[in-house]
Amino acid sequence: MKTNIFLFSVAMIVLLFSCAKDDSNYTYSDGEYINIEGIQNTYTLISQKDRLQLSPVVSSNKDGDFEYRWGIYETSVQGRVEPLDTIARTKDLDYFITEDAKAWVLVFMVKNKKTGFTQYKNTTLNINTEFTRGWYVLKDDGSMSDLDLFLIPTSPKSQERIDNIYSTVNGRKIEGKGTFLSFFTAYKSTITGALGNTRALMVSTEKDIQSISINSLKTIRDKNDIFLGGPKEVGPPSFVFMGSSANYAINKGQLHHIYAMSANGGQFGDRLRIDAKDSPYQLAPTFCASTYSDPILFDNTSSSFVTLANGSGSMMVNFAEDAPTIPLTNMDRNALFIGYKEAVYLPAPVYAFQVNGYGIFQGKSDPTFKSIVYMEQNQQKLKATEQVIESSKKLYNATQYALLNGDENMLFFVNNNQVWNYNLSNAFEQLQFTPPAGEEITFIRHLKYTTAADTGYPFNLFVVGVKSAVGYKVYMFTKSSGNLDATPYQVLEGNGTARAIFYISPNVNEGTFPNN
């Protein structure tokens, strides 16, 4: 039935094109035809990159004065008849593709103004997007952020860079310095016209939090409507990440969430309380989060580990102590780093994953005290084991940290603009990378992609972002036994300061990369 309605709509469009503003009395000659050549039945194109350039050959068995029209309409639209959008009124077409990734129909109409006879040709346009595979780099100029996309058509090695792809699509940049990138496959939105799951890149800056459709790279929500209750001021620390039962946003050190099992429209709820008294709190700008469990968070105000039990409710809870452990509350510590290491499945009677991670902590009353804390999370229970960091260690004066996801028991860190690793089993430290003069390290991260279904794309890379007077570089290293290879696998380069990187492909989901 919908097909019949749709064909009727197209027929009416053609009829209107033939007859609108045309009061002449035409004599239609028998057997008139207009022949259109040079247009294929199907074209496959990349949105925001390709131009469709066609030069059809038009001929007729009648003397004619021709006028032309190109139109495009969307297929498989439920509940409404989609109008034909005119994109040109010339014989030759030169059209930059901006449509969303899906099937469209291109209509070419030729009208003989002398007789009123009209011929049209339909062509299927299969619009794809390059946004769904590649390296996304979140960068800024000190006050405004944007995204660069590095295309990888055959392997993780980049072959082309698209500068400022976010602002190219949306016509504006994102306010604030970049802080974090994450990805949801089931973010709820109405960007397709009906509420449903949306593959969304989550972009966090010091002044904005946005959900962006990875299909079109168009903004779904930003700080004006991504929180319930209307526009909300965003400030550091600001991050969006995933847990086992909810999506989370930290804004100005306060926690918001979207419970995964709730009916929602992609908006984070009100600020969560930390206790029944609604005591003030300030979450550390670091966390251990994955799809295996509720996140491990740390409140620097009360010096306590906290989480949101089962991703639901309006109040965080303290972890129950899983002895033997150091105290988990009122620790007289600030968290400098908390990160995910691995998840281990526990069989009967637990039937759940234990998440293991590490944290770096500094004393409050004695700032010279620093320690490594090994964390073992069994649902709402937490066991924490502490080891003092000696002041002679390079790790003692580290400024940035990154754990290896499930690989060697190594903690990577930055000291004096150099990348080192620290063996968590024996405390051995080793220099790994010194950037060239004039380059300053802006972030480090381990990214491992092992999806067998994505033939040719799996990788295991340690990433180092740097900035210089001329722009940014992102060094990508393979490694062996926890040590970086001397020569980078590849180096991505662009303008501005790189703050974060994320790999996107059709097979990437929330659980592909831990949210460190």
Q: What is each residue range found by the language model?
A:
Residues 1-7:
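Positively charged n-region of N-terminal signal peptides that target proteins for export
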Residues 15-18:
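C-terminal motif of bacterial Sec signal peptides marking the signal peptidase cleavage site
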Residues 20-164, 453-456, 467-516:
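Acidic/polar, low-complexity intrinsically disordered N-terminal segments immediately downstream
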Residues 131-136, 199-201, 357-359, 408-411, ...:
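Entry beta-strands of beta-propeller and related beta-repeat scaffolds
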Residues 141-145, 208-210, 254-255, 418-419, ...:
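Short glycine/acidic-enriched loop and turn motifs that connect beta-strands
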Residues 163-169, 181, 185-402, 406, ...:
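Preference for solvent-exposed, low-hydrophobicity sequence contexts
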Residues 173-179, 333-334, 338-340, 391-396, ...:
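Repeat-based blade/solenoid architectures
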Residues 365-474:
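Intrinsically disordered, low-complexity segments enriched in Gly and acidic/Ser/Thr residues
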